[in-house]
Design a protein with these regions (language model features):
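Jelly-roll (double-stranded beta-helix
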Residues: 1-286
């Protein structure tokens, strides 16, 4: 059994641009190797925006050395980047962007969501790239809700969406550079499930709604992060109410993590190179 090593409550909300009120559930500055290959998770919302005419969001900014995974639960987000990719993602959709050697992108509320207003609820997860892949070509995976397989869990426990990795013989659509699982969980009140992750893997659970008892001992509720030991291969979850959560698990990279703002590399020299390349326009343009 994977043991609980900590349960952490989200800090107070802060704004990213004028469109994303986020709670930073963790970052590599706070958890580092403990959550490798995952670097950061921002939980935006739930927040109700009024109707408007001007798109809210965050303007053009760079990334290098990792991937950003945006999962939308309510509202719509529009993306554009320097590779020429772009589009709108809505409830259930996922955008998996590989920054790699360098990318510029912008993220705003979609035009229709701006006009209508309503609830925004989404996550952005940063996934580190192995050292050998940090300078891979930037890329973009647009994963619609219809592309993501949903598994009905046994004994009426609920449902599980396989965004990346595998659950039993079901595979998620996302291509990844290292072995990992990203699962959306919907657990029914009073039901329980045992989930398995490989021995030695990082495992963490973010509760988005409701409350869950982990391994029969400690509870995690909305806005909390539960981190489990790399040792062991199972965790037991019991929902005390209707619960939604994101489960992340992956093989630790066991490589140095050196970050500066939107760049995450393996040493300071590489960070300096990233800054120079960005300032000299080598990340392209939108």
């Amino acid at each position: 059994m994977k043991q609980i090593t900590g349960i952490y409550s989200a800090p107070s909300q802060h704004w990213v641009g004028d469109g994303f009120p986020v709670r930073s559930m963790f970052s590599y500055q706070t958890h580092g190797q403990q959550l490798s290959p995952f670097l950061l998770l921002d939980y935006a919302g739930p927040y109700v925006f009024p109707m408007g005419n001007n798109k809210r969001g965050v303007g053009v900014h760079p990334h290098r050395g990792f991937e950003t995974v945006t999962i939308v639960y309510a509202g719509e987000v529009e993306h554009r980047d320097s590779t020429g990719h772009g589009g709108v993602i809505g409830p259930g959709d996922v955008q998996w962007m590989t920054a790699g050697a360098g990318i510029l992108h912008e993220e705003f509320h979609s035009e229709s969501f701006t006009r209508s207003g309503g609830e925004l609820k989404m996550l952005q997860l940063w996934v580190n790239l192995p050292a050998k892949d940090k300078m891979t070509a930037p890329g973009y995976q647009s994963i619609t809700a219809a592309m993501i397989p949903t598994v009905t869990l046994g004994k009426g426990a609920g449902k599980l969406r396989v965004i990346a990795g595998h659950y039993d013989d079901v595979s998620g659509p996302a291509h990844t550079f290292s072995p990992l699982n990203v699962w959306d969980l919907q657990l029914n009140h009073g039901r329980d499930i045992t989930l398995y992750q490989p021995e030695g893997w990082t495992t963490a659970l973010v509760v988005l709604e409701g409350e869950v008892i982990i391994n029969g001992s400690e509870s995690a509720r909305e806005g909390q992060l539960a981190v489990l030991s790399q040792s062991g291969d199972a965790l037991h979850l019991e929902a005390t109410t209707q619960t939604k959560a994101l489960l992340m698990a992956g093989e630790p990279l066991q490589e140095p993590i050196v970050g500066y703002g939107p760049f995450v590399m393996n040493n300071k020299t590489q960070i300096a190179e990233a800054i120079r390349d960005f300032n000299s326009g080598r990340f392209g343009q939108i």
